[in-house]
Amino acid sequence: MIVEELKLINYRNYEQMNLKFHPRLNVFIGDNAQGKTNLIESIYLCSAGKSFRTNHDQELINMNKKQAYIHVKVKKVHSDVHIEVRLNSERKKDLKVNQIPLVKMGELLGNLNVVLFSPEDLKLVKEGPSERRRFMDREISQISTKFYYTLSQYNKILQHRNKLLKYNKGKEIDIEVWDEQLAAAGAWLIVYRRNFIKKISILAKLMHRKITESIENLEVIYEPNVKVKENDEVDVIKEKILQNLKENFNVDKQRGLTTCGPHRDDMILKINGLDVKTYGSQGQQRTAVLSLKLAELELVKGEVGEYPILLLDDVMSELDSKRQHYLIHNLKSVQTFITTTMMETLKDLKPEDRAVFYVNKGQID
């Protein structure tokens, strides 16, 4: 999978921009606040349908403009894909794939797979479970639209149940209808997440051993809020969720929200048996996240048959020279986009192996 071309009109600080990319490595270099990350963001937007920096589309439109437009041409193994995103300050965004309008956001997923690594990803090990759930859900959604729609359904049912608990002080019999639906969707979420962690944990462990030269052992552990066994089938999991909901009803009613279920799941990272969040050094935390990101590349390749695009936003300065070298020289099969303020770490790459774009105030040389 390769992003061949990118076109921007009135996107962030770019009034009009047309770029063609190198099939392996593309480097956006320039001082801070010049627009490097905006380029990475626009590619990500064409993959996920939303920014990784803001939930407000208005912020993506050039100041004093009403619309913005993004177009990417993606070369895949069996076909070319054209993705268009039109942002409007007065209505929701319009999405097209090969000139066909998309009705649902989920229809965009899988047309352009990306793995993003930015300084914000350290939240995976530094902050609470919501960051780790977001990681799991984002990556699974790229390879399974069924999971994406099940997650959307679960969240809608959860909102209804919480409203009943909070505003109407619903009786248990009123809640039971929602419990059945919530448990059915939730059971599938647990199955998908469990399978995902099983696969990515093996890959992340291998990546981590390569990076640390087998000195450290990384474990990625799925920790569902509802306690299930490794071999529990979806029907068994559903019954366990229902039982939890019933047992927690009085607590839920008192708090006005649902206190158990997949929306409270977590993912634990351990190095040599110790929780990285609590006991890991800054370097170990970075390496654990890097290993996860590299594992994502292999997981997507295994699921869809080709590597996703790797987006590295201002992370080279976060890694030591050994990890920088490993990252740059072990991704020859993956098209990579890097934003950086200096070329020092990339100087030993041959000119024919990369393209360099100098970014200055929304202009590119």
UniProtKB/Swiss-Prot annotation:
Molecular functions per Gene Ontology: ATP binding; single-stranded DNA binding
InterPro entries the UniProt entry points to: DNA-binding_RecF, DNA-binding_RecF_CS, P-loop_NTPase, RecF/RecN/SMC_N, RecF_2
GO terms (BP aspect): DNA replication; DNA synthesis involved in DNA repair; double-strand break repair; SOS response
Source organism superkingdom: Bacteria
Gene3D superfamilies assigned to the protein according to its UniProt record, in alphabetical order: P-loop containing nucleotide triphosphate hydrolases, RecF/RecN/SMC, N-terminal domain
Subcellular location as annotated: Cytoplasm
A Gene Ontology cellular-component term: cytoplasm
Main location: cytoplasm
SUPFAM superfamilies: P-loop containing nucleoside triphosphate hydrolases
This protein's record includes keyword DNA-binding: yes
UniProt protein name: DNA replication and repair protein RecF
